[in-house]
Amino acid sequence: MAVAAVGRPRAVRCLLLLLLSFLLVAGPALCWKNPDRILLRDVEALTLYSDRYTTSRRLDPIPQLKCVGGTAGCDAYTPKVVQCQNKGWDGYDVQWECKTDLDIAYKFGKTVVSCEGYDSSEDQYILRGSCGLEYNLDYTELGLSKLKESGKHQSFSDYYHKLSSVDSCGLVTVAVLFVLAFVVYKLFLSDGQGSPPPYSEHPPYSQHSQRFAGTAGAPPPGFKSDFTGPQSTSYGASSGFGSAFGGQSYASSGPGFWSGLGAGGLLGYLFGSNRAATPFSGSWYHPSYPSSYAGAWNSHAYSPLGGGAGRYSASSNTESRTRTTSGYGGTRRR
């Protein structure tokens, strides 16, 4: 009886030690598991947004979507939402396929999913919600062709915007041209005397013809003085026979002629220099454009890059079109 009583406490102690050992081993797995510590290979999908940040524990949070370069540049287009699917394990890390809607001129280049390791950058466990996408944005073939086309029309578009811009001197230039045109009109095209009187067999002498009448020379031999008007010894023009058809004669040009000639020359210079700096090669009202504009001016081709409402371009279709594009890449732990 004494031996049995002594053996029972030992068995109880052994049982308690085994139970304690089991709790120490299985406790963290059963009761103390951290829900934010997950195995990266168990993540099946990621939905990332351009206006959100990742969670963080050891490091600072990063944007869920981050452009890091590419042929198109990061300012060309920004996707709103990207979804990445776990495509499997390649022996090194998880591989991803990321899809989003992009403009038809752009596509994903190199992509990589970056996740924060839970304890270190080498930890196979990651912090839940710490993954983000880093991507390159490249041009498609259509985007490259649009880029080349926009380069052809660059000079024309720049000139139009300079003329229509409030900050440019286009309005001042136009105002100066109008003033010069008015001066030339007054000097050359405006006739203060009105239209000549109708034809008459015996027209009266006008003021201009009287000025020239006193200076007419002697008629040649064989001509009557009735057809030549009064004679004078000074050199000048006749107002008799000629005035019957012309109605009036004009005085010689004075200083107004030379000032008008100078203004006209200045106006022609300004028009010439303005046309030389633009792609216009024809007349002002009917410009002739380079061969690249032919067939494209009234076409509905895709508008050049950077085009917008009110911009003068070779395309009338400014509607943006999108398509679903995919990018493929691996994982980087940070």
From Swiss-Prot:
Record field: transmembrane: 169-189
Compositionally biased intervals (Low complexity): 313-326
InterPro entries (UniProt xref): SARAF (IPR009567)
GO CC annotation: endoplasmic reticulum membrane; endoplasmic reticulum-plasma membrane contact site
Keyword Transport included in the entry's annotation: yes
Keyword terms, alphabetized: Calcium, Calcium transport, Endoplasmic reticulum, Ion transport, Membrane, Signal, Transmembrane, Transmembrane helix, Transport
Major place of residence: endoplasmic reticulum
Membrane topology: Single-pass type I membrane protein
UniProt domain comment: The cytoplasmic C-terminal region mediates interaction with STIM1, while the N-terminal lumenal region mediates regulation of SOCE activity.
Function: Negative regulator of store-operated Ca(2+) entry (SOCE) involved in protecting cells from Ca(2+) overfilling. In response to cytosolic Ca(2+) elevation after endoplasmic reticulum Ca(2+) refilling, promotes a slow inactivation of STIM (STIM1 or STIM2)-dependent SOCE activity: possibly act by facilitating the deoligomerization of STIM to efficiently turn off ORAI when the endoplasmic reticulum lumen is filled with the appropriate Ca(2+) levels, and thus preventing the overload of the cell with excessive Ca(2+) ions.
Protein name in the entry: Store-operated calcium entry-associated regulatory factor
